[in-house]
């Protein structure tokens, strides 16, 4: 057995501290490192903190671990591969205050948008993970045919369209302002939370594969790892994203499927020309057919993130095995060059061609709450394309649920897994 315990320093420090320990008999928890003595030094031995194991190193699991550890719990974060290695590292990072209004996620989204703003102030998010308010525009683009490609040269600039968007864009409409829309770099955001929790709140990070949750007398007691390692727990949080269904404890209760989404990251030569305007496109291919709905997110890093081309697909066991479909990447590159001359080949470097799986439920509502019939075992998954937005409020709510017995930041009734029980309404 090889267990890798990783501690993450402050994001401004370029090197990670990675310690590899090999021992066939001892459990991973005995090798984990507490990087802050500030919490442990004041801990009352007669009133030990609640031991919580959070399974899943994506944004939902990390936000949950962050708020739990900040709230005084002794938290172990278990991740199979690496922090933010899946959708949380490859998402767009777009945040919206009111785009979920009128739906089941409205209160969660509003609370989380405001919590993102607070976290950015607390963690210096503008510098550490690219938090910033942005404008959002809806645009229509009809892909030019070869015979009409010269029309782009004669395009009259629209004052309502950012100057760098010099392709055949039409029908601009403002759908978000700096008061209602914002962005983060999701990978940097997730890593920043882990760093803060490790350094100041005693979070332990263990790299290992979850095999099962041991249940005794109707309560979760131990997290069992592949290879035989065990971590004792007073509570367990399962934030497994699209891998939720692979755990029999949850797969028998409800379905979470994976929507495979593709993205590319470009770095234009003239990055300063790109303004902080998120673009939501109705894109009509030259060959006809159903219009596409790609999204374009300029980042303060100087990069431009473009995503789209989503379809349900089988989720592989290993997140590192998720590979993009070449045709989907080709389409996104075509979209890029029709959006802006700054994004054509030769004017922009391709930094990433990637794919990830968004966790979706059959009723399009996240699953957040205690697992029916298993006291002390909680689930948080199924956030689809709004995982980065709703991560903070989900994490804060689950933390309250675990430590206090109920959540005050948002009413979790609508998200409870009990809705999947036969006869529930």
Model-assigned labels for residue ranges:
Residues 138-143, 259, 326-408, 412-425:
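Flavin (FAD/FMN) cofactor-binding core of flavoprotein oxidoreductases
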Residues 66-67, 93-95, 127-133, 235, ...:
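Active-site substrate-recognition segment that forms the wall
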Residues 122-208, 212-219, 224:
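Flavin (FAD/FMN) cofactor-binding and adjacent substrate-gating region
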